[in-house]
Amino acid sequence: MKKILAVFAVFGGGGVLMSADIEDSTLKAIFENFEKSSKNDSIKAGLSPRQIELSNLAVIIASGSLRLWQERVEKSELKADEIMELLRQSTAYLGMARIREFIFVTSEIYKRKGVKITDFALESDENRLKNGQNLQIELFGLATTDSMKGELTQIGKYLSQNCFGDYYTRVEILSLIEREIITFFLLAAQGDTSAQMKAHAKAIFLQGLNKEKLIALINANIALIGYPRSLNATAAVIEASK
């Protein structure tokens, strides 16, 4: 007889309702065995456990799995500032509407543990724009910023100032290659992001992670993301490498 345990966790103000947890020992064994073996294969391919964990966490956020996120954060060896920085960056690709509860729950975890999160002052609009554009050029070349004209002028400015200027610039917490890995897997987990995945795959190549390693990193996420989106992400990587 299957044991069904309904767990409701309500946090003040936000009111997060945790879904019912259906205990299935067969599925649990299959999932854990496959995830472990795929991660081991990726490590053999030259990836670090840190790179794998960052990609896994990005997939979990983009998939909206709040419970799994809580479980992984509780066990994570990443620093609190690194976890929170990953969440902040995710806001640019998923939006605050999807990230808010993750931020709230994560903050509660670190409050309970007595861990303080570092706050950072907001740069001026001019500096954020300039620094963001410089990072875009480093990652994608001049063509990217030059292409944002006409109807795309305003969103192009926001991309430079907000998406890159507000988040990517804190490379002392997460490096550029780590941020690109996070972004790629935020995109991969959403689906219908082939063009964006190709662009960020090219940026990852420029940062020193080759096609084979990026595909191995995708394989380390199949258990979480599923086969269709893993195949789509792999196709984008292959196309970007041509």
Where is each model-derived feature located?
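Short, structured motif recognition centered on aromatic/hydrophobic residues
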Residues: 52-60, 86, 178-188, 217-218
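Short, mixed-charge aromatic SLiMs
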Residues: 76-92, 203-216, 221
